[in-house]
């Protein structure tokens, strides 16, 4: 994946404005989510996001050394020190709801539970850390041999989260938010994913795909 929407924020606002102008005509209620690496966040953009975005995804991979290894700036310096204060401000401005910090763990940080707990220590209450999807030839790619370590890490993370909740230090970890009476994961677990039911990817050239994972694979172009 790639692309930072705040690099062309005028288009973001144009999309929202256009959708709002046609939703009543088509009996729709559009909900917008924006994903950002935070480099270009400022007070004006935060205010717009809080007024127009149903959800916000803030890209942060956890500990400073982990984040800066995978998310360097154009000049090679790390991004952690620049983005964390902005993310904290935005999360607090949304009352710690309707957002999540989204990290990616790789072969480099199979001890990702430490990254989850680090983000919790930063004050974030909505946290998601997902496994990387990468070419197997990449040095940071996850291999089958890594799975026992990953499974153990999830178990240790569950223990840590339970301990913190008993101490009154709660936070939500997306993969553990399972409520069979209507939790956020239950529908996806039943149907596999939102492709074909609630999901559509639109490219900059206007091509349609059932999911962003398929973009560029012409056999899936709709």
Predicted features, each with a name:
Residues 1-5:
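Active-site groove signature of glycoside hydrolases
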Residues 222:
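Cysteine-cluster motifs in flexible loop/terminal segments that predominantly coordinate metals
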Residues 138-218:
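A C-terminal junction/extension of Radical SAM enzymes
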Residues 8-134:
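Radical SAM/AdoMet-radical enzyme domain recognition
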Residues 6, 73-77, 141-148:
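Charge-dense, low-complexity intrinsically disordered segments
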């Amino acid at each position: 994946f790639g692309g930072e929407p705040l690099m062309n924020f005028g288009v973001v606002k144009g999309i929202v404005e256009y959708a709002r102008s046609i939703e009543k005509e088509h009996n729709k209620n559009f909900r917008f989510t924006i994903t950002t690496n935070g480099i270009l966040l400022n007070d004006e953009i935060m205010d717009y996001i809080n007024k127009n975005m149903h959800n916000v995804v803030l890209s942060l991979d956890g500990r400073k050394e982990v984040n800066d290894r995978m998310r360097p700036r154009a000049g090679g310096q790390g991004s952690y020190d620049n983005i964390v204060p902005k993310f904290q401000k935005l999360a607090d401005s949304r009352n710690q709801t309707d957002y999540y910090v989204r990290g990616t763990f790789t072969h480099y940080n199979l001890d990702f539970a430490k990254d989850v707990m680090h983000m919790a220590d930063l004050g974030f209450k909505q946290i998601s850390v997902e496994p990387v999807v990468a070419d197997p030839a990449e040095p940071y790619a996850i291999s089958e041999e890594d799975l026992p370590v990953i499974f153990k890490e999830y178990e240790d993370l569950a223990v840590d989260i339970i301990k913190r909740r008993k101490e009154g230090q709660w936070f939500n970890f997306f993969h553990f938010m399972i409520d069979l009476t209507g939790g956020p994961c239950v529908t996806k677990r039943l149907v596999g994913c939102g492709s074909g039911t609630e999901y559509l990817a639109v490219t900059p050239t206007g091509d349609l795909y059932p999911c962003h994972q398929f973009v560029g694979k012409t056999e899936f172009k709709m």
